[in-house]
């Protein structure tokens, strides 16, 4: 991994690395925050998945998470949201193509050559983190919007691999929402059964489980009712007896003003779980 940015932050280092991804067949950037204690010992890892139009920069520059990661001794890994490059398929819209990988493995041309974000996040990136950084095997996952969707899907499909999961403003029923329907039709085709592998509410209804789910949702979020549908997640978790910590916040929208207001509580939540044995 090639170091392309290095910034001192709260006694640790906010770095950005570039590497060639075998899963995605392109160069990828990834942000890695190494807290002060990473200089002397191995630490657990929190993976953060960003939302539509984002890259690796949004979370590391806007959330203020470094203060809390340093306090709680957690490495934070923030990858890009899709494969990148002039040779990678794209669309002239913000919710499909580059910047909108949806953390799935595409099966339809032209997307299936590069869009394997599920494999990248689940397998390739953790292997690289273990190889290059002082990381323990204990990891958790979180994200925002499309990234909250990705975090929930990865945790629900791989409950033994992630200690905990949380999300800000996630797309919880993508097969029922315009963003998800349009992306899934392009990436996965018209067989809607394939869509359900990347739909958190559907996965839970099929019996997939995690110990607990933490979600924060702003009630002034323009996408709340049509795209996000947080109450659907709350309802299915109640029906399937999955413990939740779902909080609704008056006045907060879909932006990083919202994420930055509560990211400290999410990192503390994951730190508590990661440090339990």
UniProtKB/Swiss-Prot annotation:
GO cellular component terms given for this protein: cytosol
BP term (GO), one: formaldehyde catabolic process
Active site: 145 (charge relay system), 221 (charge relay system), 254 (charge relay system)
Catalysed reactions, as listed in the record: S-formylglutathione + H2O = formate + glutathione + H(+)
Domain of life (superkingdom): Bacteria
Tagged with keyword tRNA-binding: no
Keyword terms, alphabetized: Hydrolase, Serine esterase
GO MF, any single term: S-formylglutathione hydrolase activity
EC top class, as a word: hydrolase
Stored Gene3D superfamilies: alpha/beta hydrolase (3.40.50.1820)
Family: Belongs to the esterase D family.
Function in brief: Serine hydrolase involved in the detoxification of formaldehyde. Hydrolyzes S-formylglutathione to glutathione and formate.
Name used for this protein in its record: S-formylglutathione hydrolase FrmB
Organism: Escherichia coli O9:H4 (strain HS)
């Amino acid at each position: 991994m090639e170091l392309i940015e290095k910034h001192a932050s709260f006694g640790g280092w906010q770095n950005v690395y570039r590497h060639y991804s075998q899963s995605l067949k392109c160069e990828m950037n990834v942000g890695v925050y190494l807290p002060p204690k990473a200089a002397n010992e191995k630490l657990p890892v929190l993976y953060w998945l960003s939302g539509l139009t984002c890259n690796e920069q949004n979370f590391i520059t806007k959330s203020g998470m470094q203060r809390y990661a340093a306090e709680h001794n957690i490495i934070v890994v923030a990858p890009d949201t899709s494969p990148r490059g002039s040779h990678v398929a794209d669309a002239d819209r913000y919710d499909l193509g580059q910047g909108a990988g949806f953390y799935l493995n595409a099966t339809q041309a032209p997307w299936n050559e590069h869009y394997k974000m599920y494999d990248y996040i689940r397998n390739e990136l953790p292997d690289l983190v273990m190889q290059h950084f002082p990381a323990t095997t204990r990891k958790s996952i979180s994200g925002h919007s499309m990234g909250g969707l990705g975090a929930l899907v990865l945790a629900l499909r791989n409950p033994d691999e992630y200690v905990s999961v949380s999300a800000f403003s996630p797309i919880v029923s993508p097969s029922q929402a315009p963003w998800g329907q349009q992306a899934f039709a392009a990436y996965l085709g018209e067989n809607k059964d394939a869509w359900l592998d990347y739909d958190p509410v559907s996965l839970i209804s099929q019996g997939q489980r995690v110990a607990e789910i933490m979600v924060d949702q702003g009630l002034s979020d323009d996408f709340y009712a049509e795209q996000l549908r947080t109450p659907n997640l709350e309802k299915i978790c109640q029906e399937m007896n999955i413990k939740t910590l779902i909080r609704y916040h008056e006045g907060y929208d879909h932006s990083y003003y919202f994420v930055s207001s509560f990211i400290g509580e999410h990192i503390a939540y994951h730190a508590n779980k990661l440090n339990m044995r």
